[in-house]
Amino acid sequence: QAAVAEALRLQLGDVLVQFTPGAGVYGHSGADDAAFDAALIAKHLTNFSILLKWTREDEHCWEPYGSAMQCNLQASVNSNGEITSWSHETFSDTFLTRPVIGKDPASRLLSTHYLKESKPWPVTPPMLTVHGGIHRNIEPIYNFPSPRLVKHRVYDLPLRTSALRALGAFGNIFAIESMMDELAEALKLDPFHFRLKHLNDEQGIQTLIRLKELVDKDRVNFPQEAGLGISFARYKNSAGYCSLAVLLRVNDDAEVELIKIFCVVDVG
């Protein structure tokens, strides 16, 4: 309401927004932009009721994107296979450009940037909340001594970005779990045991153990030349646990054949 009123230069009380439940969305969709497009047309075509719909193609082309991320990790291990130092730096754009009252909401509506008197794109400051935005799940759940964790807010990238479900957790967890696999391989250690060696969280431990049991039970059926990859995370280190194993095969033409997925989730 505040964003539409500001963009159309109307009083707040002159704008009535009626919410209608619809399909869910994992983050920031084009719903606010489509609503403003309808209001913008209605202001110029008085005495008409305006029904405006974005097509699926419209939404995929114009909705905010989840931000690209680059993660740089370094780690050291001792002779006992224990991680003794850990550094994780993440570079990314903002995950928050929803129209929020008090934060120049009109500038967060897409069409305001194509009007004759266009708005500048908003510059959002870095989020400082625990596990928010870029640094969501940058803190490893594993027991590392004094991990070094740094986030870098990158500005002036070419695409409009905003919330895509899990925010920075996607990239950060992928980076952490990839690093754990690389370290386990370099040390010639079982990737399950290597993770368990660095976990103090009992629920997390049981989640990983259960996954290993499922994998081991089915291992006799694994096709030749198939590879198995595993990953583990707890969302925001305070919500649900998930352990995942993927069995796949890659042929000489780099074609990937997905064979089986094992998944253990604890959200109790």
Where are the regions a protein language model picked out?
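Structural alpha/beta core scaffold segments of enzyme domains
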Residues: 1-268
